From Swiss-Prot:
NCBIfam families registered for this protein in UniProt: PRK05467.1-1, PRK05467.1-3, PRK05467.1-4
UniProt name for this protein: PKHD-type hydroxylase YbiX
Phylogenetic placement of the source organism: Bacteria, Pseudomonadati, Pseudomonadota, Gammaproteobacteria, Enterobacterales
Pfam family, one: 2OG-FeII_Oxy_3
EC category: oxidoreductase
Name of the coding gene: ybiX
Length: 225
């Protein structure tokens, strides 16, 4: 399943990020890609050795960790270190699949269950640059407002179309979920959303408490901690 997570960063935060990224040192994006991805990747990434990068990636981690909808949809166990990329002048990233595991500075290794892209450019400021994701439900083309994030299964083939005008800047990361199975995670998310909707409409009652009990027992049964 694919999820749109709005408002991860405020417009003020996005403007500040963009101003700081204008001063960043950018390197060939293939430095973080395996052999298969390097054949189809043509973009730039912020140098991960810079002080600016360290500060910005911490801000992204804090923002997603504090976003209730992100947590409900991803049920994250481990987040990768966020990276930042830039596309311009017809740069693109052809169809590829993300690696199943990635190294992690604290945990050694993590499984990539979900991929996330946090858009940092106004969609009207560039042409092209759509994230195209192929999954079991068909093909999805994604171009979100700056500050919004998209979550999708890391097992999906995906690409970024050529940017023919302007500049597309984004942050991206991977998530190991407490729930490995996409279908089970999607069921828990739908159950959680409906519980929250019922609570806002009717307040606390025995039926909602029963549904909460069901949610947490399923999470207990399926989670890998």
């Amino acid at each position: 399943m694919m999820y749109h997570i709005p408002g991860v960063l405020s417009p003020q935060d996005v403007a500040r990020f963009r101003e700081q990224l204008e001063q960043a040192e950018w390197v060939d994006g293939r430095v973080t890609t395996g052999a298969q991805g390097a054949q189809v990747k043509n973009n730039q990434q912020v140098d991960t050795r810079s002080t600016l990068y360290a500060a910005l990636q911490n801000e992204v981690l804090n923002a997603v960790n504090q976003h209730a909808l992100f947590f409900a949809a991803a049920l994250p166990r481990t987040l990768s270190t966020p990276l930042f990329n830039r596309y311009q002048n017809n740069e693109t990233y052809g169809f590829h699949v993300d690696g199943a595991v990635r190294s992690h500075p604290q945990n050694g290794w993590m499984r990539t269950d979900l991929s996330a892209t946090l858009f940092l450019s106004d969609p009207q400021s560039y042409d092209g640059g759509e994230l195209v994701v192929n999954d079991t439900f068909g093909q999805h083309r994604v171009k979100l407002p700056a500050g919004d994030l998209v979550l999708y299964p890391s097992s999906s083939l995906h690409c970024v179309t050529p940017v023919t005008r302007g500049v597309r800047v984004a942050s991206f990361m991977w998530i190991q979920s407490m729930i490995r199975d996409d279908k089970k995670r999607a069921m828990l998310f739908e159950l959680d959303k409906n519980i929250q909707s019922l609570k806002s409409r009717y307040g606390e009652n025995e039926e909602i408490l029963s549904l909460l009990n069901l949610y947490h027992n399923l999470l207990r049964e399926w989670s890998e901690i």
